[in-house]
Structures are given as structure tokens and as C-alpha cells.
Regions:
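Alpha-helical metal-binding/catalytic segments enriched in His/Glu/Asp
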Residues: 1-4, 82
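Hydrophobic beta-strand positions in extracellular immunoglobulin-like domains
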Residues: 84-86
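An extended, acidic, His-containing surface patch that forms the Zn2+-binding/catalytic region
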Residues: 4-77, 88, 93-97, 101, ...
Length: 170
């Protein structure tokens, strides 16, 4: 496996800062000192896998493969389909370049059939966020309100063209 580089983006940093006071001591030390342990956390993301890993790097899911119709017959051509979920530091072009470099074979072509950049992060430094946070905290007493990087695709991406900030609720 050749995962792309993990990055500590603003929403993930905010999530970790919100979680820190509620974490067990050792994890609290790490989360309160991301300036020192951020690199370690990025390395651990791959080992932890799952949601933490997906929040910190562009991910790949191989969803389709086609080749020969028979087990014992070599195909003239083989095709694989890959679903890529981008973290904001990556672009469709940078991922294509990365895949070509990792594959390292000029006989294999990487074609982008559909591409959409990651949606922008919503600000947590404005009155809208503070009002939303207060309403959530008021409605669900004791609930932690935190920035979060939604790793699923949603229809909210359609609102980014006419809204400065689109907040997703999970």
C-alpha cells in the first residue's frame, strides 16, 4: 500500500483540541501538544485506520476491476476503477500525478473520468459557528460541539457555490 501523506487540517485540529480535555491522560498530552506530536499523530493515523485515517489523508477505494472473462485467459486489456475521496490539500490533478508515480509503469494509463475538488472547510471563527454551537449545546446538554471533517459525500457540496460556510451535522 502507498497511502498519501497524512495532514493535520484545520477541522481535524479543532476536533482534537475539543476532545483533548476529555481524553485519557496520555492522549490528552498528545492532543494538547499537536505542535510537537502532530507528526506522530499523522503516522499513527495509518496504523489506526478507519475514520481517523480518512480524516487525515486522501483515501482510495478500488470499486471495480475488469479483465478476462475466463480464469485461464490473459486479457488484452484490464481496467480498474478507483473512488478517491480528497482532503483539501490535494486536487484531482495532484492525485493523478501521485497514482502515476506510484504505479511507475508507462504502459498503465491513469484516466480521470469524473473529478470534483473537496469542498471548502466551514469557518469556526465567526458568529454563525458560535450561534450554531450554542444552539446545539443548549439542545443537547453535555454534548461536545466540535469542528469535524465529514468523510462522506453529501448534497451539502451543492450549497458551497452560494454560501460562505456550509456546516454539516453529524
Amino acid at each position: 500500500a502507498h497511502p498519501m501523506k497524512a495532514v493535520l487540517t484545520k477541522p481535524v485540529y479543532g476536533l482534537f483540541q475539543t476532545m483533548a480535555p476529555h481524553a485519557p491522560f496520555a492522549l490528552r498530552v498528545v492532543l494538547n501538544n499537536l505542535w510537537c506530536f502532530g507528526g506522530l499523530l499523522c503516522l499513527l493515523a495509518e496504523k489506526l485506520g478507519g475514520e481517523v485515517n480518512a480524516m487525515m489523508r486522501t483515501t482510495f477505494a478500488f470499486t471495480m476491476a475488469q479483465g478476462s472473462k475466463q480464469i485461464n485467459v490473459m486479457p488484452n486489456q484490464a481496467v480498474a476503477g478507483v473512488n478517491v475521496r480528497l482532503v483539501n490539500v490535494d486536487t484531482p490533478e495532484s492525485v493523478k500525478t501521485y497514482m502515476e508515480k506510484v504505479i511507475g509503469d508507462p504502459h498503465v494509463s491513469v484516466c480521470v473520468t469524473h473529478a470534483q475538488s473537496a469542498t471548502p472547510y466551514a469557518s469556526t471563527d465567526n458568529a454563525h459557528w458560535h450561534k450554531l454551537s450554542a444552539a446545539i449545546a443548549h439542545t443537547w446538554k453535555g454534548c461536545l460541539v466540535s469542528p469535524y471533517l465529514m468523510i462522506a459525500c453529501s448534497d451539502s457540496r451543492h450549497y458551497t457555490g452560494f454560501c460562505d460556510d456550509v456546516y454539516k451535522f453529524s
